[in-house]
Amino acid sequence: MEKQTGELDLEFFLNSGFEKKQCIKCGSYFWTQDKERNTCGDTPCDEYTFIGNSPVPKSYSLSEMRDAFIKFFEKRGHKFLKPYPVVPRWREDVLLVNASIYDFQPHVTSGIVRPPGNPIVMSQPSIRMNDVDLVGITGRHLTSFEMLCHDSFNTKDKTVYWKEETVHYCYDFLTEGLGIDGKLISFKEKPWSGGGNAGNALEVFVRGLEVATLVFMDMKEDPNGPYEIDGIRYSKMDMRIVDTGYGLERLTWLSQGTPTVYQAIYPDIIQHVMKNSSVSDIDEEFLSEVVKASVMKEPYEESFVISQLEKRYPDARQRFEEIKKVRDVFLMIDHARSLMHMFAAYVIPSNVKVGYLARMLIRRAYRAISNTGYRGSLMDLIRMNHEDLKDIVPDFPEQFVSDVLSIEEEKYRDVERHGTQIIDKMISNKGKLSLDDLVLLYDSHGISPETVKAYLETKGMEIDVPDNFHAIVIKRHEKGETEKKKYSDYPEIETRTLYYDDPFMREFTGLVLFSKGNEIILDKTAFYPEGGGQPWDLGYFEYKGKRINVVAVRKYGKTIVHTLDGEIPQGVRVHGVIDWERRSRLMVHHTSTHLLLGVLREVLGEHVWQNGVQKDVEESRLDITHYRKIDEETIRKIEERVFDLIREGREVSVRNLDWYSAIDKYGFRLFEGGVPLTPKIRVVEIQGVDAEGCGGTHLKNISSIGVLKIRKVEAIQENIYRITFSAGVPALHLFQESYEASYGISTLLKKPIEEIAQSVSELSKGYADLRRSLAEARRRDIENRIANAKKIGTPGAEYPIIEADDADIGEISRIAHSRKVDLIVETRIAGKFKYTAISPSKKARDMIRKLFNADPEGNDSMASYINEYSE
């Protein structure tokens, strides 16, 4: 980052006895009240000196530390916000919340949406998977944690507070709130970047432990910007945002001084596991030294840690191996906590996106449970974690979690049973396995690298498993959907959206403000542009007595562009007519999609989320998350509930609400259909059934749908089901077509319609019986022909030969192998003779060579030769 001279030379530092120094080890600048300090406080420049020597007078539990932080800042005018889910439904570019600022990116940080409070304080559960391989090993790494924050959002017109107040608040909380000696605190200068924003930052350390980061976000990504961080250029933005992050778990650990962070935050669960497993005790003295050594080299290296321990403990290597089970205890509890947060957000394990990350944690936890001999279950650990955090995760779907885990455990056991067969197959194809093969085995089959390594050792083979193996795999799955920006060369003309003013408007008159070729932009339009899974409207414009058809309608920002099959000049008024039959069917299908989604949640469970949608004129499709097959009985139940609601005639309302007012009322279900970057959310609500942010056109009452019929339900990928349906007139046509087909069948069978299913079933059974009889007769015929076949060859090498059709080769081969008979089959293809040797004794190629003096095609079980001479 280009140096911004003095931007962190704050009055608070200068007036509070701080000195700015340069670390003698890493060269970073830092602020301290300790005249003797010459290192920045960060590891490896400083060691962990708080273990067994806490600088906090009182020992805090996790909940006590959270309460202390929140109350401290509430007293100082900060609005408390409840935590968001760990799955950011309000964003499409990331899979999990990694930090509290994710709650406000990009809608608040861009200035589009007003913050829900200013300033605010909260404790946000977060999940980071980049260090998953180090969990349990270093004593400090976690996959899930709570980020405490006190943030302010400053605009050009109003400054709430900025750098001076932020640092002052931090210092006061640590000293007055927790009782830490100010001389033990150091503030290290370091630039920060993330989520398209950046700014100067201070990292806060106490006795070697980083407890907070204070970010002063005032920059945005800009390829021409004057500032650079990690190869990305930035420029100043209009807003100045205080983005702080205090590690709740680390502050709790600091207050207790335990050997590891796990013992500070999971004391009761650890005790439970040790009482119910083969792990009897913890060598706390040695474990403390392991943790201290692990921070002295980045990235973590086991060999380095052992070498440091051997300076003090002659048997360090042996003791290091002995504590690995303890580390598995820490790992499975940590992973259970992350899973508790994921399941509370209704994540369904799968092979893609956030579901993949959940499955990875589940399988790592199962392996740790196996290694430690824990006699409980993963569900027990998740339940205990929820008990510890029920204040911040009040609603926990226990039955959903139990159902999902039972399915996942069976899949895991299946991998354990059949994994070696898959490994053997890969070895036979490739010989030596590589890192890419390890990743493939884990990614596609769920076989852990530890399992592969152990199995290869039994076969005298070796493979290196990198310490960051899971981080390598995660990089393939961690990115969310990055929205493709729509670029256009059109002028920025705001087109009034008549289809919102009156969705039932069929005709209108507008002024052409821009024309180029066969494209025009009007001052207003009733033509709906493509968006939200709803296709664009069709219709025509009347100009000079001619009809010019509209073939496409697209929206770029606030500009709506109409593509025509002719040309209309700029500056003229035109009369537009919507293809109303098409639009009305699209409106029926769009409203039906919302209705169906609400009913699916009601019938299948709250875990159902929209995963994709496409509306059309004749039928529409809705993709949902679900973990069990949807059977015919369930489909009938869904259709009947939809029909009941249609008969009730629920109203459909459309309102434009402020972001946070809408979220407070409806929750994050609002974003099932997408995330609008607008100051307000257009909420479409079907009374008591569904409420979503939606930009489509809708009916006024669901009674106008008339009828809905599910045409097909299919699993399009693991735990994603596609429901194809028709509503309104297309559904009526579907019923009519079905009746006509049924009537035709009943006429042919001379049976009433209500009896045709039974009649067809009987016919089908009779047909199946006939096929079996024919197959049996065919088999007996082939056996007789083999038994009575003449032989060809020379004495000692004679083989039966039979004539047959090429289509019979498969059946002949099965019979020959069952009877262990080597034979020749003669077939005729395009006037040529083909001779096929079938040999259960594995000498088919040799048979062709000896009998026909020819080079055969095929293998030792079946080989063939074609005589090029025609009959």
Swiss-Prot record:
Q: What class of enzyme is it?
A: ligase
Enzyme Commission (EC) number: 6.1.1.7
Q: How is the cofactor bound?
A: Binds 1 zinc ion per subunit.
List cofactor names only: Zn(2+)
Q: Which SUPFAM superfamilies match?
A: Class II aaRS and biotin synthetases, Putative anticodon-binding domain of alanyl-tRNA synthetase (AlaRS), ThrRS/AlaRS common domain, Translation proteins
Q: Where is Zn(2+) bound in this sequence?
A: 590, 594, 694, 698
Q: Where in the cell is it found?
A: Cytoplasm
What keywords tag this UniProt record?
A: Aminoacyl-tRNA synthetase, ATP-binding, Cytoplasm, Ligase, Metal-binding, Nucleotide-binding, Protein biosynthesis, RNA-binding, tRNA-binding, Zinc
Q: What Gene3D superfamilies does its record include?
A: 2.40.30.130, Bira Bifunctional Protein, Domain 2 (3.30.930.10), Threonyl-trna Synthetase, Chain A, domain 2 (3.30.980.10)
Kindly give the CDD domains that the UniProt entry links to this protein.
AlaRS_core
Q: Does the keyword Acetylation apply?
A: no
Catalytic reaction equation(s): tRNA(Ala) + L-alanine + ATP = L-alanyl-tRNA(Ala) + AMP + diphosphate
| Gene Ontology annotations for the cellular component aspect, listed alphabetically | cytoplasm
GO process annotations (BP): alanyl-tRNA aminoacylation
Disulfide bond residue pairs: none
Q: Name one Pfam family in it.
A: tRNA-synt_2c
Q: Which GO terms describe its molecular function?
A: alanine-tRNA ligase activity; aminoacyl-tRNA deacylase activity; ATP binding; tRNA binding; zinc ion binding
Say which family it is in.
Belongs to the class-II aminoacyl-tRNA synthetase family.
Q: What is known of its domains?
A: Consists of three domains; the N-terminal catalytic domain, the editing domain and the C-terminal C-Ala domain. The editing domain removes incorrectly charged amino acids, while the C-Ala domain, along with tRNA(Ala), serves as a bridge to cooperatively bring together the editing and aminoacylation centers thus stimulating deacylation of misacylated tRNAs.
State what this protein does. Catalyzes the attachment of alanine to tRNA(Ala) in a two-step reaction: alanine is first activated by ATP to form Ala-AMP and then transferred to the acceptor end of tRNA(Ala). Also edits incorrectly charged Ser-tRNA(Ala) and Gly-tRNA(Ala) via its editing domain.
Question: What is the protein's name according to its record?
Answer: Alanine--tRNA ligase
Q: Which organism is it from?
A: Thermoplasma acidophilum (strain ATCC 25905 / DSM 1728 / JCM 9062 / NBRC 15155 / AMRC-C165)
Q: Which gene specifies this protein's sequence?
A: alaS
